[in-house]
Amino acid sequence: MVLMIVSGRSGSGKSVALRALEDMGFYCVDNLPIILLPNLASSLMPRNTPAAISIDVRNMPGSSEIFEKVLTKLNKKFSTRLIFLDANHNTLIQRYSETRRLHPLSGNHLSLEKAIDEENILLEPLRSRADLIINTSEMSVHQLSEMLRVRSLGTKERKLSMVFESFGFKYGLPIYADYVFDVRFLPNPHWDPKLRSMTGLDKPVVDFLKRHSEVHHFIYQTLHYLNQWLPMLENNDRSYLTIAIGCTGGKHRSVYIAEQLADYFRSRGKNVQLRHRTLEKRKE
């Protein structure tokens, strides 16, 4: 089992690194005390899932000998790698000034500069044992994520997951969606008493919508739009692209359209997920 330990100076990008590793399929735990590392790793071993653990200065043991013993113990059972993130002194000061966050050691009545210096000393045992040291001073969030992907997986490729979700406007917008398409202008099966109790998954509703040319035009133009920009989105360091399709109740039109879009991209080898928000709520 691969066990990635992520540490480094506060403000150097540990949270970004942990999110990137999580996107790569690692089971991630933030700010775990070092003495608990062996127990956690052992509990994860049956899953054979790669894990990433972040450690900051607040979780350092009282002596470097304790850390050495823990790391030696882990190396006997796991494929352990220690990544240490660093940044220049002035860069760290600038980042803290921009975010206005408190340094973890500032609570000890230290100025920001002294807290940064003190942390640097305390983290030296970790830095000295690191398999990889990354200075993030001149790196963007995307560049750090890309470097970790290449170093961890040995490839720059990561497959984008396209999530198609139908919903009803009457129940509210999905705020996490990257794109929202409103299909309330399309012919509504709700007004046909025979179709009202059905959904966009049922053949009579599907046949009803297929008979209308505007439905075909909407699907065609939406596919054209997504196909046009998908290559750039795939290269934009994202794991998910969520496309929400909304009609009034989230039962007929949006369900059918989401199904059609998902089928198209699935047939072209894309990693596709499909959700019907309103229909799932009805089952609960």
Swiss-Prot record:
Annotated segments matching region RNA-binding: 266-284
One Gene Ontology term of the molecular function aspect: RNA binding
SUPFAM superfamilies, A to Z: P-loop containing nucleoside triphosphate hydrolases (SSF52540)
Sequence positions that bind GTP: 56-59
Domain of life according to the entry: Bacteria
Positions with a binding annotation for ATP: 8-15
UniProt keyword annotations, A-Z: ATP-binding, GTP-binding, Nucleotide-binding, RNA-binding
Subunit architecture: Homotrimer.
HAMAP family: RapZ_like
Family membership noted in the UniProt record: Belongs to the RapZ-like family. RapZ subfamily.
Function comment: Modulates the synthesis of GlmS, by affecting the processing and stability of the regulatory small RNA GlmZ. When glucosamine-6-phosphate (GlcN6P) concentrations are high in the cell, RapZ binds GlmZ and targets it to cleavage by RNase E. Consequently, GlmZ is inactivated and unable to activate GlmS synthesis. Under low GlcN6P concentrations, RapZ is sequestered and inactivated by an other regulatory small RNA, GlmY, preventing GlmZ degradation and leading to synthesis of GlmS.
Designated name of the protein: RNase adapter protein RapZ
Source organism per UniProt: Hamiltonella defensa subsp. Acyrthosiphon pisum (strain 5AT)
Designated gene of the protein: rapZ
